[in-house]
Regions:
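Conserved N-terminal segment of class I S-adenosyl-L-methionine
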Residues: 1-131, 178-179, 222-224, 231-253
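A conditional alpha-helix N-cap/helix-loop micro-motif detector
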Residues: 46-48, 143, 200
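S-adenosyl-L-methionine-dependent methyltransferase catalytic module, highlighting the catalytic core
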Residues: 125, 132, 136-137, 145-252
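Hydrophobic adenine-recognition pocket in adenosine-nucleotide-binding enzymes
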Residues: 140
Length: 253
């Protein structure tokens, strides 16, 4: 890993905040409580790299508008960015959230946070009620039935977006190469991690094509994880991160 990324201000502050976040979770609920099981703070490494690749500053991207965290889980990054001075709007869907959004509310109360928390259904006709300078849309796209509609709608209300999702270079049986074409694989209900909320896994060119067709310009892109990736297996898990700018100009209502 590039030491300039590893020791960047964003990453260093994030790792310190992670320690505080984990302590708060221990005090906020019993040990049996079902917290989001993944480390959201590892996303700061690719986000910082994308930012550097594009030559942009976070404050420049956010501007004077709020930062939107779509798929906030327990609010790890929402509360972190609030600690950096950003006004944050954190959204998730209680119907699919592991603890029905109790976790994010418990942490908010413990922190005395002013983060605006909203329970939304992205596939249920969600329409942003305000404009955003920067959106975080991480690890959520493949949980959507209609990612095109959501990403297109977001491009009308946010100027910049950090997007990440699972991608695949090969079909599950590795007989069809997906990575050379803009394509998407539709998962069976039990095909990926036994999670019925997983739907579309794009090829890397497919994700770029989707973003462009939805009204975004791709400013920077990187991929992490498996090299011979597929849509279904743990060993074949690859993620693509994009830094996007709306091609529609300033967000409109």
């Amino acid at each position: 890993m590039d030491p300039l990324i590893r020791f960047s201000s964003l990453v260093r502050h994030g790792l310190r905040f992670r320690s505080r976040f984990e302590l708060i979770k221990k005090d906020a609920a019993p040990a049996s409580f079902a917290w989001y099981p993944y480390d959201s703070f590892v996303n700061l490494f690719p986000l910082e790299r994308l930012r550097c690749m594009a030559g942009l500053e976070l404050k420049e991207m956010a501007g004077s508008r709020p930062l939107l965290d779509l798929g906030t889980a327990d609010g790890a990054l929402a509360f972190f960015f609030e600690s950096l001075g950003f006004t944050v709007h954190a959204c998730d869907h209680s119907g699919t959230n592991i603890n029905r959004m109790q976790g994010v509310r418990l942490v908010a109360a413990a922190l005395g946070s002013k983060v605006e928390i909203e329970d939304i259904d992205l596939d249920g006709g969600w329409a942003p009620a305000q404009e955003y300078g920067l959106a975080l849309f991480l690890g959520t796209l493949y949980h959507l039935k209609n990612p095109f509609a959501v990403l297109e709608r977001l491009s009308k209300h946010a100027r910049y977006c950090f997007l990440s999702t699972r991608v695949a270079g090969w079909s599950p049986d590795h007989t069809v190469e997906l990575g050379r074409v803009p394509a998407a694989y539709l998962l069976a209900p039990d095909e990926c991690n036994q999670d019925t909320t997983n739907y579309w896994v794009f090829s890397p060119p497919g994700l770029v094509r989707l973003a462009e067709r939805c009204g975004w310009r791709v400013l920077a892109s990187l991929r992490t994880g498996a090299r011979d990736s597929d849509p279904t297996t743990e060993a074949g898990d690859e993620r693509q991160f994009l830094l996007l700018e709306s091609s529609r100009g300033e967000p409109i209502s």
